[in-house]
């Protein structure tokens, strides 16, 4: 019989997923549904690191998948993408310098191609505000409305991703650092806040092109059709039904 999990096991969770129906396993801060889009053996890895009140979540996939993800109440999400990541977020193609900010309970649709890596930073909004207020920078605080794509200097966004990836690599090799030493979790969270806020300071609202807007509109149409189909279990659906949605 397996004993009670150690502090290190609670702080660092690694989940390897081969079945998309298990996509929500071991990730209590996110609600996630996934669909595999290629008929080959799937290998998705998720690493979650719990800091004092924040969390860092790493995802990678070897195949094309589509997910619907939302952050549970009480957290804001900031998502960065690896240098080899190809795909879309809410229909918007992932590209260098792109950063996504999302409020809690806001569903986002993501299509990830094979070789994808992303890191999601989850933080309580009151912690961000407290961090800024202590440094007399409270005016910088902004709660995203829905899902906000942001654009910044690609090098700045890359540094944020690299910081998160280094944290993940450290947690994989030395999980006890985060589970047994509160000082390490506190230091990591403070460094996360400084690194994230430094990136947000140089970020602007994303200026979408006409092609971007077309892709985003198509994404909304697909999502609406899927929602309708899922609400009609067991019924035979026709294209004319979807046209009425």
Feature-to-residue mapping (PLM):
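Conserved short histidine dyad/triad with adjacent acidic residue
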Residues: 15-17, 37-70
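Conserved hydrophobic/aromatic beta-strand scaffold that supports enzyme active sites
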Residues: 48, 56-58, 76-78, 99-101, ...
